[in-house]
Curated annotation (Swiss-Prot):
Main location: membrane
One of the protein's GO biological processes: establishment of protein localization to organelle
Membrane topology according to the record: Multi-pass membrane protein
UniProt subcellular location: Cell membrane
Keywords attached to this entry: Cell membrane, Disulfide bond, Glycoprotein, Membrane, Transmembrane, Transmembrane helix
UniProt entry tagged with the keyword Disulfide bond: yes
Function noted in UniProt: Part of TspanC8 subgroup, composed of 6 members that interact with the transmembrane metalloprotease ADAM10. This interaction is required for ADAM10 exit from the endoplasmic reticulum and for enzymatic maturation and trafficking to the cell surface as well as substrate specificity. Different TspanC8/ADAM10 complexes have distinct substrates. Seems to regulate VE-cadherin expression in endothelial cells probably through interaction with ADAM10, promoting leukocyte transmigration.
Source organism of the structure: Homo sapiens (Human)
Topological domains, Cytoplasmic: 1-19, 85-94, 256-270
Name of this chain's protein: Tetraspanin-17
Topological domains, Extracellular: 41-63, 116-234
Amino acid sequence: MPGKHQHFQEPEVGCCGKYFLFGFNIVFWVLGALFLAIGLWAWGEKGVLSNISALTDLGGLDPVWLFVVVGGVMSVLGFAGCIGALRENTFLLKFFSVFLGLIFFLELATGILAFVFKDWIRDQLNLFINNNVKAYRDDIDLQNLIDFAQEYWSCCGARGPNDWNLNIYFNCTDLNPSRERCGVPFSCCVRDPAEDVLNTQCGYDVRLKLELEQQGFIHTKGCVGQFEKWLQDNLIVVAGVFMGIALLQIFGICLAQNLVSDIKAVKANW
């Protein structure tokens, strides 16, 4: 009888996983670079790039930081995943997996701590908002962010309109010469749907009125309470978004690790 020849299939790198990871990270890389470019452009417009000390001069949060940090992280991850998959570089793929895993566990830890220490988080949020209320006129991006939050959640200040007493332009002291004295920003005002033109002076002198009278002109609920209410009302949607992000991260880690295993198996047969 003629001898039987056995054919062994040599291990190979899966093309589907490789190019899916490559394509996914190309998009991630481009988006990260776009975010980073927007952040740097915004800093350039505000003169921050020519005066780095301006970063620490602002008393509140500079929203541009969000673009720079998120864009930077996305760019680094996208670069590592994209080049790692294309060049079959196990170091970059492992870096991608570890970095993504670290972000995942930080998100998980933050979520657990936020649930366990709810009261502490609420106090820190109050403090954070009030620090930004103080710096309201210091930075146009911060001002726009606060106005957006107050309009979106129909709120005013961290706990209420009187938090605006912390701002030098809106406080009620006799030494305050500002026309905005004892007022609030226009974003606190109850908007009339019939009004076509925004009245930016609607909050002037409003805190001189009694609290019951104020309710007809401005939102009297604090943004911390309104944010908590919004979270409760949209809990399923918010949880779904975070679950989707978490699953995407886990999928990316598994895909990268699978690709690393394939590459090692191929190299072992050289």
